[in-house]
Amino acid sequence: MFSIIIPIYNSENYLRYSIESVLNQSIGFKENIELILIDDGSVDSSPQICESFKNLYPNNIKIMKIENSGPSAARNCGLSNVSERSKFIGFLDSDDAFSQNALQSVYDFFCDSEHVNIAVLPVYYTGEKEGGHKLNNRFEKGTRVINILNDYKAIHFYIGGTFYRRHTLTSTVLFDESIKFWEDAIFFNQLLLKEKRYGAVAEGKYFYRKRKEQDSLVDRSWFNKKRYTYLLNECYMTLLMDSFNKYDIVLPYLQFLIVYHIKLFLYPNYRDVYKSVLDQQEQRVFVDDFIKVLKFIDPQFIKEQDMPMYYKEFMFHLLKENTEALENIKKERVLHSSCTVTSAKIKGLRLELTGHFINQYYEMKENDRIYIKYFKRLKKCKRKELKKTIEVWGYKLRDFRYAGFVVEIPIWAFAFDFVLKTPNDSLELNHVNIFKSLLTRVFKKR
């Protein structure tokens, strides 16, 4: 009934865990599951682990061996070895796992939704990180069919935990082995552009292992030239053109997906790496192509993203868009922002507080001031200049030089409010009980 494909490369530490999650499926392994293990040139004990499981279940497990060719080639090898009797195909990575009810949940969904050919599971982290993936909000309404023409925010771009009716993955539907980045997102979303809908199966779970060495590999990928202009053109532009050719527009779903992913280029750990990887001419081409991709995006889908405001401002800046729409959001959000107390020192009968008002929505100006309000008194804080800015690709997005403050208040005024005063406005910010905060820290340490 199910064929589960696992590409394997040097996965000895977690491979048993992954395979056993398939063996333990409540739907019944011997009766309903074919497991296809593709050894992609492993040099550890992964091949021996595969053989040990095949000896236990010779009728259910296939082992294929290829030279080290990458996950796309391994998955394609798996697809070409799916049995004729299989009705559904699923993908699992060699250090991840399925919940025990995963395949039964997917099977029930496909039985109930005969017109839907793709299904996905919610992702939960295991290992170095725990909790649910940010995109799991799609599953909050329970198991359902998502039509991407209507629900453009329900984006998906990873391959583990995805399932397909066998007839959907014909001999022409393969992973592009020439693409070295984001190949799983290309595969899934090119197919989704044709299908238009997929099932969000809320009952099952896909456990994605978060590892330190994995993070290290991700970090190293930013030092590969193909992570830049190549990714923009061969991945983002490929999807944009596919949508344009099929629908005569770039679907909002794809616009939202690409902005969600392209923001990675702006993250503090990555945004300046390109300068050490690309020469000056390549840097200019990269930035030009970055802007070229953004020009396919309606500013609405930038504005709606859950990301820091200054990333949105930077994208608007590159597009030469009016930021008035963002300014309205910033005015609303600054009311919910807080001053931070970084130190509190007792000086006789007085309390010296040092802190700052740094947030993504507001940059304090020279004539702005922070005040402390205790009882009916309003006390002006002294300014403490900070050397903190946020710059992306040479463009200064925030300068927090005026955001610091220092103030002395009577020791008995342990509860107070922060107030931001500008030439045109006065905004009450957060309430602070300094003794309560100190007690909380003490109990946390215990």
Swiss-Prot record:
Keywords: Cell wall biogenesis/degradation, Glycosyltransferase, Teichoic acid biosynthesis, Transferase. SUPFAM superfamilies: Nucleotide-diphospho-sugar transferases. GO terms for biological process: cell wall organization; teichoic acid biosynthetic process. Signal peptide: none annotated. GO terms for molecular function: glycosyltransferase activity; hexosyltransferase activity. Gene3D superfamilies: Spore Coat Polysaccharide Biosynthesis Protein SpsA, Chain A. Pathway: Cell wall biogenesis; poly(glucopyranosyl N-acetylgalactosamine 1-phosphate) teichoic acid biosynthesis. It comes from the Bacteria. InterPro entries: Glyco_trans_2-like, Nucleotide-diphossugar_trans. Belongs to the glycosyltransferase 2 family. Involved in the biosynthesis of galactosamine-containing minor teichoic acid, a non-essential cell wall polymer in B.subtilis 168. This is Minor teichoic acid biosynthesis protein GgaA.
